[in-house]
Amino acid sequence: MKEIKIKKPIKIRKPTRSYTGIMWITNGTNKKYLAPDFDNRCAYCDDSDEYSGGYNSFHVEHFAPKEKFKHLEFTYDNLLYSCSYCNISKSNKWIGSNENESVLGNKGFIDPCNDDYYNHLGRDQNGNIISLTPLGEYIYYELKLYLKRHFILYNLDQINIRRRALKAKIKEKEEHGEDTRKLVKVHRLVCEIFCDYYDLLVKEEA
Ligand SMILES: [Zn+2]
C-alpha cells in the first residue's frame, strides 16, 4: 500500500460563522459577511479568491441544497463562501432525507466549519488535497478536489507568503543600511517560481 505522509491540514484555518442565527434575505448581503468569515477562501478546497477570479467569481454555497430545503436558502448557518468549482461540483447533492442528515455511512458531506471535516481530508507534502477516510474519499471525488488547480493555487499562496516576507525583510535591511544583495537574489528566484506556477494556472484554465 502506498504510504502517504500528511504534512498539513486541508485548510490554513478552520472558518467560523460570525452571524449565527441571523438571516439576510439576499445572497448579495450574505456574501459580504461570508467572505471575511471564510478569509476570502473557498470553504471546501481553501483556494484564495485572490488568484481565482476575485470576490465576484466566488459563490454563496448552500450546504443543505436550497433546491431540497427551500427554507434554508438565506439561513446564514447553512451558507458557505465557495469557489465556483466546488459549488458547481456539489450542486444539489444530498444523501440524507432531511436537512440534518448530511452523512449516511461513508457517503455525504461535512460542513468545513465543523472540526470533523479535518479528520477526513488533508494535504500531502506537495500541497495536493488527499482523502484520509472513506467518507473523505467520497467528498474528494464528489467535489473534484483532485483538480490540479487546487494544488497550483495552494502553492501560489505559499510562495506569495514567502515573497511578501522577503520583501519586508529587504525593506527593513535597506532602512538600516545593510547589504541586501543575497536576499534580493532569493526574492528574484521566488518571484520566478511564482510566475511558473501562475503560468501553470493559466494553462490549466485555457
Ligand atoms: Zn473550492
Label the predicted regions:
Residues K90-A165:
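Domain-level detector of nuclease and nuclease-like folds
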Residues K2-Y44, F69-H71, D77:
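Short, charged surface segments at domain edges that flank catalytic/cofactor-binding sites
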Residues Y138-A206:
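C-terminal, charged low-complexity interaction regions
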Residues C42-C45, C83-C86:
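Short cysteine-rich clusters marking metal-coordination/redox-active sites
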Residues D47-L79, K90-G105:
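Histidine-centered nuclease catalytic patch
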Residues G28-K32, D115, R164, R181:
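Generic alpha-helical secondary structure signal
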